[in-house]
């Protein structure tokens, strides 16, 4: 081990540490960071060399953050990244500094975003917040209005998590939806992501995603927002149901097909206990 450490350059050590951090399961960033810190044994090198990994993790995970003085949380995403550690809260029309390691927001200041699309953005956000409140008790959403390639574009992000360290599991749901405000008909593009880590008496991870495309009729702001939410709800319900059904099937068939009649320990295994993981069901109720 000592010989291996001598062969690794600081750059290689940081690269390995950054990979561990970026792939940390939801809710376990601090645990992974502390383990990597012990392995690297060089705080300055870790902070300077892996700073990009801290940022990438928060962007990828849609990390929610509470800004002092404001009621609603906002998501840390690439769509709100203003550069130099600053992020946009489109609902409250402010920007703020975000510490990717401490996950803290500071220095909120007024910020004017794309005013030309604000009425559309606001209508979609109002409808999406109602949807999230109904389906995701711990959910947070942020809606952006941006001009992309000359087109007025709405981007809606949803995050919901349950961190149950005492019960040995953590999970996070993320979805991102995008459409351009164009006359008559537009294309809605979405991606749904679910990630769960269960680590009692074993180590099981669920990492799944699904791409969505659908057509949206564009009329006025309120009606378009309503139709958009119908698409979101149908797609997310279908995906969550499919996840649950797949785990039921795996419990009934796949896992049982892998077993011995009697394991090496000569003790029969309760394969139905695998179903008790209830990963899909737990996230569906998240």
From Swiss-Prot:
GO terms for biological process: actin cytoskeleton organization; barbed-end actin filament capping. The keyword Phosphoprotein applies. One of its GO terms (molecular function) is actin filament binding. Pfam families: F-actin_cap_A. Gene3D superfamilies: F-actin capping protein, alpha subunit, F-actin capping protein, beta subunit. Keywords: Acetylation, Actin capping, Actin-binding, Phosphoprotein. The modification Phosphoserine is found at residue 9. The modification N-acetylalanine is found at residue 2. GO terms for cellular component: cortical cytoskeleton; F-actin capping protein complex. Belongs to the F-actin-capping protein alpha subunit family. F-actin-capping proteins bind in a Ca(2+)-independent manner to the fast growing ends of actin filaments (barbed end) thereby blocking the exchange of subunits at these ends. Unlike other capping proteins (such as gelsolin and severin), these proteins do not sever actin filaments. Component of the F-actin capping complex, composed of a heterodimer of an alpha and a beta subunit. Component of the WASH complex, composed of F-actin-capping protein subunit alpha (CAPZA1, CAPZA2 or CAPZA3), F-actin-capping protein subunit beta (CAPZB), WASHC1, WASHC2, WASHC3, WASHC4 and WASHC5. Interacts with RCSD1/CAPZIP. This is F-actin-capping protein subunit alpha-2.
């Amino acid at each position: 081990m000592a010989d291996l450490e001598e062969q690794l350059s600081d750059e290689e050590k940081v690269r390995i540490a950054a990979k561990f951090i970026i792939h940390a399961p939801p809710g376990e960033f601090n645990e992974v960071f502390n383990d990597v810190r012990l392995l690297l044994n060089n705080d300055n090198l870790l902070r300077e060399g892996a700073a990009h990994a801290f940022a990438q993790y928060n962007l990828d995970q849609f990390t929610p953050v509470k800004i002092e003085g404001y009621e609603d949380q906002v998501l840390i995403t690439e769509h709100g990244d203003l550069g130099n550690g600053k992020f946009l809260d489109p609902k409250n029309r402010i920007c703020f500094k975000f510490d990717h390691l401490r996950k803290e927001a500071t220095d909120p200041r007024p910020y004017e975003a794309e005013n030309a699309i604000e009425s559309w953005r606001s209508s979609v956000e109002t409808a999406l917040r109602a949807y999230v409140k109904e389906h995701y008790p711990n959910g947070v959403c942020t809606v952006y209005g941006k001009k992309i390639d000359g087109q007025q574009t709405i981007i809606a992000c949803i995050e919901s998590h349950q961190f149950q360290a005492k019960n040995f599991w953590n999970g996070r749901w993320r979805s991102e939806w995008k459409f351009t405000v164009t006359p008559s008909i537009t294309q809605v593009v979405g991606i749904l992501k679910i990630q769960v880590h269960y680590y009692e008496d074993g180590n099981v991870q669920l990492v799944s995603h699904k791409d969505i495309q659908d057509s949206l009729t564009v009329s006025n702001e309120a009606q378009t927002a309503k139709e958009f939410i119908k698409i979101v709800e149908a797609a997310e319900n279908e995906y969550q149901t499919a996840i649950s059904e797949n785990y039921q099937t795996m419990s009934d068939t796949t896992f049982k097909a892998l077993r011995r009649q009697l394991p090496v320990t000569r003790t029969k295994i309760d394969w139905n206990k695998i179903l008790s993981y209830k990963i899909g069901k737990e996230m569906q109720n998240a």
